[in-house]
């Protein structure tokens, strides 16, 4: 049971890592959408006639900041991906350990049942032998 609870704990930690990856993926998608929206707004701002350079420069700076944020999120997702793999390996190892212990427990149970059956047969043989001897006397 201790090994099963350790395995369950490892599964929970793996699920946490998956949730962290999902959150990072969502944030990365939101940043990508914001980058696209900023580009579209920048294109619309550049129309024939008047050009607002301050607005264009500000939009470019904002887009650069968003790209940096997206890169950071990508690095974080890569790190979380490595952690997911480590936790997945830990879960697999815990599963193997639990299965091995279950097999061992089953073998011990079978061995015990076989020993009990042999004992019962021996007792029955002794009773039959005594009965036969008493009948011969």
Predicted ranges, named:
Residues 1-137:
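Charge-rich amphipathic alpha-helical interaction elements
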């Amino acid at each position: 049971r201790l090994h099963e609870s350790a395995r369950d704990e490892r599964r929970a930690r793996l699920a946490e890592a998956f949730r962290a990856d999902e959150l990072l993926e969502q944030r990365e998608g939101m940043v990508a959408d914001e980058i696209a929206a900023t580009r579209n707004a920048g294109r619309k701002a550049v129309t024939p006639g008047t050009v607002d350079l301050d607005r264009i420069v500000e939009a470019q700076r904002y887009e650069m900041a968003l790209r940096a944020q997206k890169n950071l999120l990508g690095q974080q997702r890569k790190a979380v991906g490595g952690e997911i793999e480590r936790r997945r390996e830990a879960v697999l190892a815990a599963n193997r350990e639990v299965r091995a212990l279950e097999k061992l427990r089953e073998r011990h149970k079978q061995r015990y049942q076989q020993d009990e059956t042999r004992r019962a047969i021996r007792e029955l043989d002794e009773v039959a032998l005594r009965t036969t001897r008493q009948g011969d006397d």
